[in-house]
């Protein structure tokens, strides 16, 4: 006795298996993240802690109301709105113990020492595989002084490969 399987059933199962295969491949690739993207999320605080009072408030005589205002501006939220002419709270202000330099780029406060889209100056974008290290676009995949992220140095004699020290 031979069991006959209809052609439509065979076609449907093969089509279904192909669809499942492509769905699995598509979802697994979208979840994979480059190592430097993960580092950005870990090292990215929500606020800039200012090293000095913004120039917009430096001429104000200190009263009880302005003390509250000045203490509010000791930290600036990332991407806070600004205006170059009328409300420039981040015009060359140093933050995070000198590791950040804030400028008003397209109506938002940006760190020109570490922002890939505003590296060194407003609007200067770093290319693929580059990060903004101290205001300079730097390739971090094979650089032993900036391996995978800015200022991560490999030990002497150890190569930086694909963003990892001693990758093998």
UniProtKB/Swiss-Prot annotation:
Glycans are attached at residue 59. The keyword Metal-binding does not apply. One of its GO terms (biological process) is seed development. Residues 1-30 form the signal peptide. It comes from the Eukaryota. Keywords: Apoplast, Glycoprotein, Plant defense, Secreted, Signal. The record marks 67-68, 78-79 as: Cleavage. Highly expressed in flowers, and at very low levels in leaves. It is found in: Secreted, Extracellular space, Apoplast. Its main location: secreted. One of its GO terms (cellular component) is extracellular space. InterPro entries: Stig-like (IPR006969). Pfam families: Stig1. Interacts with PRK5 and to a lower extent with PRK4. Involved in the regulation of cell death induced by extracellular reactive oxygen species. Only the processed peptide, and not the full length GRI can bind in vivo to the extracellular domain of the receptor PRK5. The GRIp-induced cell death is superoxide and salicylic acid dependent. Belongs to the STIG1 family. This is Protein GRIM REAPER.
């Amino acid at each position: 006795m031979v069991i006959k399987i209809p052609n439509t059933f065979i076609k449907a199962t093969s089509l279904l298996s192909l669809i499942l295969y492509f769905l699995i491949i598509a979802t697994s690739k979208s979840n994979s993240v480059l190592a430097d993207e993960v580092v950005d999320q870990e090292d990215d605080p929500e606020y800039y802690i200012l090293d000095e009072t913004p120039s917009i408030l430096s001429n104000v005589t200190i009263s009880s109301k302005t003390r509250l205002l000045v203490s509010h501006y000791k930290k600036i939220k990332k991407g806070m709105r600004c205006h170059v002419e009328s409300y420039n709270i981040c015009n060359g202000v140093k933050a995070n113990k000198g590791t950040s330099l804030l400028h008003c780029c397209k109506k938002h406060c940006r760190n020109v020492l570490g922002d890939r889209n505003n590296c060194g100056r407003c609007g200067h974008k770093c290319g693929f595989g580059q990060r903004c290290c101290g205001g300079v676009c730097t390739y971090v995949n094979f650089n032993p002084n900036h391996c995978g992220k800015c200022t991560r140095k490999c030990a002497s004699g150890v190569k930086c490969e694909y963003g990892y020290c001693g990758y093998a």
